[in-house]
Amino acid sequence: MNSRLIAGIKGLLPISSRSLRGFRVQDDARYAQLFQVINDQRKALDKAQESLDRLEEQCRGLNETLEYIHDSNGVMYWQLFRGDHETTEQAQLRFFRGLPKAEGIHALFQDAEARLFELFDQFCRDHGISYWGTGGTVLGAFRQQDFIPWDDDIDVYIAREQLSRLETAVREDGRFRITVVWDWYVPCKQIRFRSIDEDNPCFVDLFPLDWVSGDPEDAWQVCTQERMQFVQEIRKQYAGSSWSRDVYISGADPLISALELNLHRHLEDLADRVSILPTADGATGLIRGIENIDEVRPSGPYLTGDWTGSTTLPFRGIAVPVPSNYREYLSKAYGDYMALPRDMHSHEHVADEYIASPKSVRAMRRILSDDGERTPGDEERR
């Protein structure tokens, strides 16, 4: 019989048991080698994890040592700096108020920001609209009675119904405008009070608050959870969108209306879990709006008595409303707010390219040179 035919027939027949055992032995050897490699890798990973754990423990120890040295040096410094018949806090205030001021374009920006804040404050008083300073504005008002030298912006809390009144008053007045920008990085909804002059880079940040009844602590926690859910949803929904690419969107961007619907739905969900009130009547506290930028440290809950019975702190001659327990607020927000700051030399001002253009400089000088009521082009027409 043809040998080629015989070979073909053998190829169609089942393999012998001896051949099958041979294949099985080879496979077992391969599996054993693979398992050995996996086991060796696992041991190597375990050893690497042990090394990493030791390094983390050493880093924690170093950090604790550095914290101790920093705190100890701070105590010794204040004792050396303190004058006769001067308390430690008086010495600290003297130190902070004696720090060098901003210079150059940043000084101009701070001056123009302060002027816009003055106009904002007067506008609110004229229309019976209440607000409170917050964040670095409260810290600067207490420590420096001015901007923190390495800070540039004005931060304001405003109850949601007061914000609505402000928006209406601004539309009817014509000298100012309220702008909205959605920020992908945080993400958050930036609401700002600005001059009608679009060349003016200055702004007052407006952070909405909501009145609540019931336990303010519970409401604060629920609001924090809703904020997290809101952020997770829009991060997922708009990943890969023009918003994620452009980072900041505003005006007529088609995504704005969709984002506002997302926000409205989450505010409704929050209202189902927390008793949100339209005004301060019957309120026990305030919670931060879920559209606001996140805090580094939680500063709440805010009790109604501390905020409706507010006091003022001086900020460049402006009597800025702040909660009556502003020291407690600052402690929660910043920890030891009288400690020597670690970012005096590393904290960056607002980007120069944002404020240093000739148009921006002219607009800032314009708002400083008059009562802020002129509109762009007035000086050219004169």
Regions found by a protein language model. Name each.
Residues D121-I154, G305:
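Active-site nucleotide-donor binding segment shared across nucleotidyl transfer reactions
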Residues W132, T137-L139, F147-W150, F315, ...:
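Tryptophan-centric aromatic hotspots in well-structured domains and transmembrane helices
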Residues K101-R125, V170-Q225, Q229, Y238-A333, ...:
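Conserved catalytic core of two-metal-ion nucleotidyltransferases
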Residues S130-Y131, D155, T312, A319:
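Beta-sheet entry/capping signal
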Residues L139, S164, V212-G214:
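Surface-exposed, flexible loop/turn segments at secondary-structure boundaries
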Residues N63-G133:
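Helical scaffold of the NTase/Pol beta-like nucleotidyltransferase catalytic core
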